[in-house]
Regions:
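Short, structured active-site-proximal loop/turn typified by the sulfatase FGly-forming signature C/S-X-P-X-R
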Residues: 74-111, 151-153, 361
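A contiguous, mid-domain pocket- or channel-lining segment that forms the substrate-recognition surface
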Residues: 127-130, 135-238, 246
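N-terminal secretory signal peptides
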Residues: 1-26
Length: 394
């Protein structure tokens, strides 16, 4: 019998840990019913992941994070399943799904994503264009495995993420980070700053109008277009006119990167769902549906690109959740400011090479466990990370 979704909603008598466990169990039971997945055990045998030096050289990882997360009411619940048809029908049946991933850090999109990328709960100012304090996964990957800069990329829709690829760490830092593509900067450069017809693609921050980073873009971005992405200005602008959101533009850039550069470590941040801060419920739901579709499109691209098919693991996870309806300090779907269990307890799915298919795990883990897991799977050591490798993936 499917657990009544209402049972996991917050109450004054429940502790944050109890609420997190209820959320996890509710997601688990819903997915077992709706997607036909089985309850997994950490006592399973070794992962089917390919081992050996030759396999490691071909191994690729793609991480998709999306800003703000979405409530279970609009996703992993009977009343929300219509918004995630691709996840339920195509992605989750092929994945290992983790229902209780907690974020114990600061619930701001840049700082939370930086924490995901370093494996340490960063404490930087969420609205400052500064690099993470601790080494990023890209630096560990490139230094330990002696990989070139072309093998690690970040595609980020928000201008505030331009420092995400490289830390301030003296042991790593300068010259060892990922290359970062900001599609809004590409658009600004290609249009010579004439963005009047592209306002729906350059809106940068939904959370506070007081923080509006300048939309940059110049000769460097034009070189990225022409030399790396093999796109003419005319072709790029023509495609920009066909997309409806920043994340759609980002996914177009991602596909070009996969075709032209084929990086072994590719990190994508998506941000459309954070339009929830506008307070318009219909736009929030539309963004969930768009994100669901774009994730499925990315997985199809992975399977169709010769450099990625059969040797790629895809991770999809929100940076954190959203406030619960019942929390008097929040505003339901609109924000993530209370720090309650609903805003901190999210999920992750992994699918592709080496991942057990159609399995759901409900034990607690933390979002900072991602980087140590990537290191264990790819063969590098994230020495300063504070998370733990996810044993179900190893």
């Amino acid at each position: 019998m499917l657990m009544d979704f209402a049972k996991h909603r917050t109450s004054g008598a429940a502790t944050p840990r109890e609420i997190a466990q209820r959320l996890s169990r509710s997601r688990r039971d819903f997915l077992r019913d709706a997607a036909g997945v089985a309850l997994g055990s950490s006592l399973l045998g070794a992962s089917p992941f390919l081992r050996g030096e030759a396999a490691a050289k071909k191994r690729k990882m793609i991480v998709v994070t999306f800003g703000g997360g979405a409530r279970d009411q609009e996703t992993f619940a009977p009343e929300g399943q219509e918004n995630i048809p691709y996840m339920l029908r195509e992605l989750i049946p092929q994945s290992s799904f983790f229902t209780q991933v907690t974020n114990q850090g600061i619930l701001g999109h840049y700082v939370a994503t930086a924490s995901l990328a370093t494996g340490v709960y960063e404490t930087l100012n969420n609205f400052s264009a500064i690099a993470p304090e601790h080494p990023t996964v890209f630096e560990y990957f490139r230094k330990d495995l002696k990989r070139p800069s072309s093998d690690a990329w970040v595609v980020a829709p928000s201008n505030g993420f331009n420092r995400i690829g490289e830390s301030e760490s003296r042991s790593y830092g300068p010259g060892l980070g990922a290359r970062v593509v900001l599609p809004k900067h590409l658009l600004s450069a290609a249009s010579s700053g004439a963005l009047k017809d592209y306002q729906h693609l350059v809106r940068d921050n939904y959370e506070t109008p007081l923080y509006t980073p300048q939309i940059g873009g110049g000769e460097f971005e034009l070189q990225q277009l022409e030399m790396i992405l093999k796109l003419s200005v005319d072709d790029f602008m023509a495609h920009a006119r066909t997309v409806s959101s920043p994340d759609e533009l980002s996914m177009y850039i991602v596909k070009r990167l996969m075709q032209e550069e084929s990086p072994s470590l590719l990190w994508i941040t998506m941000h459309d769902i954070d339009i929830a801060h506008s307070g318009t419920y219909s736009l929030y739901v539309d963004a969930i549906r768009r994100t669901d579709r774009l994730c499925a499109e990315l997985w199809k691209t992975v399977q169709s690109e010769p450099e990625y098919a059969g040797n790629t693991t895809l991770f999809i996870l929100p940076d954190f959740g959203r406030d619960a309806d019942e929390d008097p300090g929040g505003n339901g779907f609109q924000h993530h400011r209370t720090g309650d269990a609903a805003s901190r307890t999210t999920w992750m799915m992994a699918l592709g090479a080496g991942v057990r298919q159609g399995v759901v795990y409900d034990r607690p883990m933390q979002s900072i466990d991602l980087v140590p897991s990537l290191g264990a799977m790819m063969g590098f050591s994230p020495a300063l990370s504070q998370g733990k490798p996810i044993k179900e993936l190893l």
